[in-house]
Amino acid sequence: MADFSAKTPCRILSLDGGGAKGFYTLGVLREIEGMVKCPIHEKFDLIFGTSTGAIIAALLALGRSVKEISDIYEKHVPTVMQKKNRREKSLALAKLGDEVFKEDKFDKMKTGVGIVTTRWVIERPMIFKTSIEQAHGRVGTFSPGFGVKVSNAVQASCSAYPFFERKMVKTDKGDLVELIDGGYCANNPTLYAIADAIMALKLPPENIRVVSIGVGVYPSPKQSWFSSTKWAQMLMSVQLLQ
């Protein structure tokens, strides 16, 4: 597990959401892994991820190499994304999660983790964490990942409603929580990771080092006001805000 001693810098890796653009994240991580010449989880004390970044973060924290994760992406991501509707996409995502993570829970992680999801009803973050040291004062009731399987937490972080169905998870306290993609709260989870380091781990800001990997910006071609696609996108935005 990570050493959260104030004597050494706390090294944070933050991975953005972005769907299939996670291939870009993996390209950057491949270079980092080549530089440090060891598994990435050995070089970072906290690895936070949202959506596609959550998949990568969880696999890195479980000790997988970037090559292994890239192979999973190349084999399975096109299959999930090519499904016709949200039910089929969600079923494919659940199947993939169960195959990759099996029965693993958060106590299997080799370093500190934060998997960012969004509570559907109250529109607030729910972050699945590994270490009791990340508990922000709720030490007495903390359990790694709320007792939820890694597979279910990652599926929730990727459940970009309405393109995927909402994900229901059951905590070890028996609570049923309906979750959607963490990107609705923080597509870039860096601030949540820094909050853990400063507020929960009580580390001074000068002892924090952050590597934040986004997925790039890809402007869409300008569309005419008379375009049906433009009006459909505007309608979708309004629905998401309601």
Predicted regions and their residues:
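Active-site-proximal beta-strand/loop segments in catalytic clefts of secreted hydrolases
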Residues: 50, 118-119, 183, 213-216
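Conserved acidic residues
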Residues: 45, 177, 208
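Active-site gating loop/helix substructures
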Residues: 110-199
